[in-house]
């Protein structure tokens, strides 16, 4: 199960994700992302307990779309478990990753 809270902060769309991002839930995240119109997005993963390969693919697709539109996407609040997955897959080199939402907002402005 996954819940997503979407807010706006100074022209940046913030998605606060809770639960698991997996093959069942990642289409919901992708759909919500495609509806937003901001050039800057932060995905807060602080309350994400699990992410699988389909979740990673969704985040990479979101990043590619933002870059193609001249925008930026940052991630924040990765747990040790989720951060480890990003490091193993080398995705930590692709994304702007911040320890918390405030730092992520500052980095992508």
Describe the function of each predicted region.
Residues 23-95:
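Amphipathic alpha-helical interaction surfaces in cytosolic regulatory modules
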Residues 1-3, 11, 70, 94:
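A generic structural signal for alpha->beta connector loops
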Residues 96-100:
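Short acidic-hydrophobic, aromatic-tinged amphipathic segments that line or gate anion-handling sites
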Residues 2-4, 106-109:
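Short hydrophobic/aromatic patches at helix-to-coil boundaries
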Residues 80, 102-103:
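Acidic phosphotransfer microenvironment of two-component signaling modules
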Residues 26, 101-102:
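Residues at or immediately preceding the N-termini of alpha-helices
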Residues 31, 103-106:
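Charged/polar, solvent-exposed surface patches and flexible loops
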Residues 3-31, 50:
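STAS-typified acidic loop motif
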């Amino acid at each position: 199960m996954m819940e997503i809270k979407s807010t706006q902060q100074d022209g940046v769309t913030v998605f606060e994700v809770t639960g698991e991002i997996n093959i069942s839930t990642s289409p919901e995240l992708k759909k919500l992302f495609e509806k937003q119109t901001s050039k800057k997005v932060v995905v807060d993963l602080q309350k994400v307990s699990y992410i699988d390969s389909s979740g990673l693919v969704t985040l990479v697709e979101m990043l590619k779309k933002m870059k193609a539109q001249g925008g930026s996407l940052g991630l924040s609040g990765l747990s040790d478990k989720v951060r480890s997955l990003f490091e193993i897959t080398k995705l930590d080199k692709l994304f702007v990753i911040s320890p918390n939402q405030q730092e992520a907002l500052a980095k992508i402005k």
